[in-house]
Amino acid sequence: MAENYTPRLKSRYQDEIRPNLQTQFEFSNVMQIPGVTKVVVNMGVGDAARDSKMINGALEDLTAITGQKPQLRRAKKSIANFKLREGMPIGAKVTLRGDRMWEFLDRLLTVALPRIRDFRGLSDQQFDGHGNYTFGLTEQTMFYEIDVDKIDRPRGMDITVVTTAVTDDEGRALLRELGFPFKGEDGKKQ
């Protein structure tokens, strides 16, 4: 890869989106303009408590989707009803920062989300009060990196976009400018 390579979405953010947000919210300081800090992709595998091989498929899928080795998440407490013991692997997560984060967001917005059948847009009510956005995907087949013939079972995932926005409105404006397909008030995609 060339040394002066900049991801497409990152250069669009720097050239177009930052000035738009500064005029829209009338920020006096450029450091007040919201930006994306990191993207966390989490895949919980509850069936791993019964079959320990299930976690390997989740690790392989997350590695293919994000291009980064996932961190294995283990149970903190034993729960008898779920036949779960403390320390058993129950999920995997990847934290993306920098250029990998921008490349993942670009692939997610331009390739993966449009491939979802009957996709009507993301809900814009899933902000946490501080400008961070979390949404869930029901299966991993929408990513081109996953070979549909080789998956053993569909696995969902949670994706959290952490921003430097102070309010939900700033975070919503940032993600809308980046190209997140939010639903409107009437339920239609904007």
Curated annotation (Swiss-Prot):
One GO biological process term: translation
Signal sequence coordinates: none
One Pfam match: Ribosomal_L5_C
Keywords for the protein's UniProt record, in alphabetical order: Ribonucleoprotein, Ribosomal protein, RNA-binding, rRNA-binding, tRNA-binding
GO (cellular component) term, any one: ribonucleoprotein complex
InterPro entries: Ribosomal_uL5, Ribosomal_uL5_bac-type, Ribosomal_uL5_C, Ribosomal_uL5_dom_sf, Ribosomal_uL5_N
GO MF, any single term: tRNA binding
Membrane-spanning parts: none
SUPFAM superfamilies registered for this protein in UniProt: RL5-like
Family as reported in the entry's similarity comment: Belongs to the universal ribosomal protein uL5 family.
PANTHER family: 60S RIBOSOMAL PROTEIN L11-RELATED
Function, as annotated: This is one of the proteins that bind and probably mediate the attachment of the 5S RNA into the large ribosomal subunit, where it forms part of the central protuberance. In the 70S ribosome it contacts protein S13 of the 30S subunit (bridge B1b), connecting the 2 subunits; this bridge is implicated in subunit movement. Contacts the P site tRNA; the 5S rRNA and some of its associated proteins might help stabilize positioning of ribosome-bound tRNAs.
UniProt subunit comment: Part of the 50S ribosomal subunit; part of the 5S rRNA/L5/L18/L25 subcomplex. Contacts the 5S rRNA and the P site tRNA. Forms a bridge to the 30S subunit in the 70S ribosome.
Name the record gives this protein: Large ribosomal subunit protein uL5
Phylogenetic lineage: Bacteria, Bacillati, Actinomycetota, Actinomycetes, Mycobacteriales
